[in-house]
Every structure is written in structure tokens, then in C-alpha cells.
Design a protein with these regions (language model features):
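Alpha-helical coiled-coil heptad-repeat register
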Residues: 87, 180-183, 187-190, 194-197, ...
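A short beta-sheet element
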Residues: 78-139, 153-155
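A structural connector/turn signal
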Residues: 71, 77-78, 106, 149, ...
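A short glycine-rich beta-alpha junction/loop motif
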Residues: 8-11, 93-96, 110-115, 147-173
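Low-complexity, Lys/Gly-biased intrinsically disordered segments
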Residues: 5-6, 23-64, 69-71, 76-81, ...
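Non-catalytic DNA-recognition/assembly elements of restriction-modification systems
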Residues: 8-42, 161, 165, 169, ...
Length: 204
């Protein structure tokens, strides 16, 4: 599918972005979203049940694939980040795993590991934020800025200063809606393929 070109473009000043439409902004993440601004207090009742998301519970390209339900008193000390609808989770440790998730309709008691940066959209479409944080160039930037060999990590405050493109609000919505639709098509094709493979294996 081809799209009409914008009348004017400008250099974004960001290597992985290249040129962007002239009326777009290029901003730091922390100007469009908060980072780690809600935590579960240590004074929380020990019998309070949480739905815990560990780094291993988020898979590249799949989002949150696994959670653990347990009382706060039995949870690891890193179970602190409160997660809300529309948040984006980005792992700040072992960044090469690309553990990034757009959160949709989570339970009220969902808590993520402090190994995640929890981005909460402010002046940006939450879906567009999720897609921007999944962009190959952005993810590669996160990995490149990580420090350490066997356990590379990036400071959440540094991650929050990374640049992303910021179209107008209507464009953000249109882009996110288009990507939602195309992603759904791909997911449907993958599901059909998996079903076909399963049928072929049954016939062997």
C-alpha cells in the first residue's frame, strides 16, 4: 500500500528517524509520557493479592504473555511498579530481549517488576506511543545505550529522554488505527498458519 507524500519534510536530527514531515515534532519521551510515577507502597497489606509481571513474562512482539498471582507478602521486593490501561512497559535490563508491552485493560492489581520502565501517556495517543516504542530504530537505540556485557541495562531516566516522532493528534490516531488493522491481519494469518501446521502434524 502506498501513501501520499507530505508537502514538506525536515531532518529529524535523529539518525534512525531520518526525515519526518515538516509539521511533526521530534520530542523526548518524558515530554509526552510520565515514567515510573506510581508505585506500590511497602506499607501495602501483606495479604493484598497482586498480578505480577516479571521480565520473563513479556516476550518480544507478543507483549505480556505470563503473570503470577500472589499475595504482596510473598512477592519479590522488585514487585513495585503499578500498571494501568494504556501504559507501555519497557524492560530496562537485558534490553536485547526486547521485552516491550502495550498494556490493554489490565486488572486493577497488576504490578510490574522494577526492571521495567512504565510509561504513562500524557499528551500522546496511547496506541501510538506503544507503536513508537516498538519501532526498530527506537529499540535499537535503547539496546545501543545499554551498559554492561552479560546483563546490559539502561537507566530509566535516560530511556525517558530518548527521542520519538510526534505527529498531530489526529495523525497519531489515524496511524495507530491503521497499524492496529494491519497487525490484526498479520495475527489472523499467523493463526491460520499455525492451525494448518497442527492439522498436518495430526495427519502424519
Amino acid at each position: 500500500m502506498s501513501f501520499a507524500r507530505y508537502p514538506a519534510y525536515k531532518d529529524s536530527g535523529v539518525e534512525w528517524l531520518g526525515e519526518v514531515p515538516g509539521h511533526w515534532e521530534v520530542v523526548r519521551l518524558n515530554t509526552t509520557a510520565t515514567c515510573n510515577d506510581e508505585v506500590l507502597l511497602e506499607s501495602t497489606a501483606e495479604d493484598y493479592e497482586i498480578e505480577y509481571v516479571e521480565i520473563s513474562g513479556v516476550q518480544a512482539g507478543q507483549g505480556i504473555t505470563e503473570t503470577a498471582t500472589l499475595p504482596f507478602g510473598n512477592a519479590p521486593s522488585r514487585a513495585r511498579r503499578v500498571v494501568r490501561d494504556g501504559d507501555v512497559l519497557i524492560s530496562t535490563v537485558r534490553t536485547y530481549l526486547r521485552a516491550i508491552a502495550q498494556v490493554k485493560s489490565p486488572p486493577e492489581n497488576m504490578i510490574a517488576s522494577t526492571g521495567f520502565a512504565v510509561l504513562r501517556p500524557r499528551r500522546i495517543d496511547s496506541r501510538f506511543l506503544g507503536y513508537a516504542c516498538h519501532a526498530e530504530g527506537f529499540v535499537s537505540d535503547v539496546i545501543a545505550r545499554s551498559v554492561g556485557v552479560s546483563y546490559p541495562a539502561i537507566n530509566a531516566s535516560e530511556l525517558a529522554r530518548l527521542p520519538i516522532p510526534l505527529p498531530t493528534a489526529p495523525e497519531q490516531t489515524a496511524i495507530a488505527t491503521f497499524l492496529d488493522r494491519e497487525t490484526a491481519k498479520i495475527d489472523a494469518l499467523v493463526a491460520e498458519q499455525e492451525k494448518l501446521i497442527a492439522l498436518l502434524q495430526e495427519k502424519r
